[in-house]
Amino acid sequence: MAQSNGAQAITTVGVPKEVKTMEGRVSITPDGVREFERLGINVFVETGAGDAASIPDSHFVAAGATIVPTAADAWAQAMVIKVKEPKEEEFQFLRADLTLFTYLHLSAYPKVAAALLKARTTAIAYETVQLSDRSLPLLAPMSEIAGRLATQAGARFLERPQGGRGVLMGGAPGVRPANVVVIGAGNVGYNAAWIAAGMLANVTILDKNLDRLRYLDQICVGRTTTLASNRGSIERALVDADLVVGAVLVAGARA
């Protein structure tokens, strides 16, 4: 989403500390700071912004950044880069001459969309930046991590102490492995399936894109089963599934 406020050269970038619960990432590394500084763009990092990511203020300073004491100081810059969408406590910092670059997922957060429109902020959502081949380069890293974590978490919740049925992903001598069904063969789905296959589970991937399924057949070399996705194939796959990973993406839509 973007609300144009005129073409202006960006000379300063602010990096506020993330305030969303359980969010420990920071939107820039010291290497990124160096790149901005090389271009003549000054970077202002809120103190402690990188602590949860094990990047202390001193590392940002060594890269050329200026550490500022408050979120307001970081938000006061021409462009602000974040990891997650602004929380309501941050709406006060939105303004017409600000460019905000972050993951927004506006379909899931209508209050954020309304706040951006009201403030007339230029907002660029990482997840909707698209190349000419329709790929989503800024969403891909998040998707890769999400897919791998989905299988890892799913394996844990199959354990009895977590309320599961006591199914081991890779089985054991004389015991079948888990049946894992992945719906969607994009970045999330592929990574979820790859980890499940590495844990020696029986893996089935469903997708409507047959070219994508052909590609996965080639790189997975028999470690997974690919199926054309439709109501019937999904129903049949789910009957015997121990773990199901939903990995369907509609760009810009609510997950």
Tell where the protein language model's regions lie, with residue ranges:
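An N-terminal-biased, well-structured beta-alpha scaffold segment characteristic
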Residues: 2-115, 119
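Glycine/serine-rich phosphate-binding loop and adjoining beta1-alpha1 elements at the start
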Residues: 2-12, 18, 88-179
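Glycine-rich phosphate/diphosphate-binding loop of Rossmann-like nucleotide-binding domains
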Residues: 16-55, 163-249
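Short beta->alpha connector loops at strand-helix junctions that form conserved
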Residues: 46-47, 70-71, 103-105, 125-130, ...
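Conserved beta-strand edge residues that scaffold enzyme active sites
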Residues: 50-51, 74, 130-131, 210, ...
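Short, hinge-like loop/turn segments at secondary-structure boundaries
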Residues: 60-64, 141-144, 220-225
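A structured beta-alpha segment of the ubiquitous adenosine-cofactor-binding alpha/beta core
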Residues: 64-78, 85-86, 226-242, 248-255
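Short, charged, surface-exposed secondary-structure boundary motifs
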Residues: 77-78, 110-113, 134-136, 214-216, ...
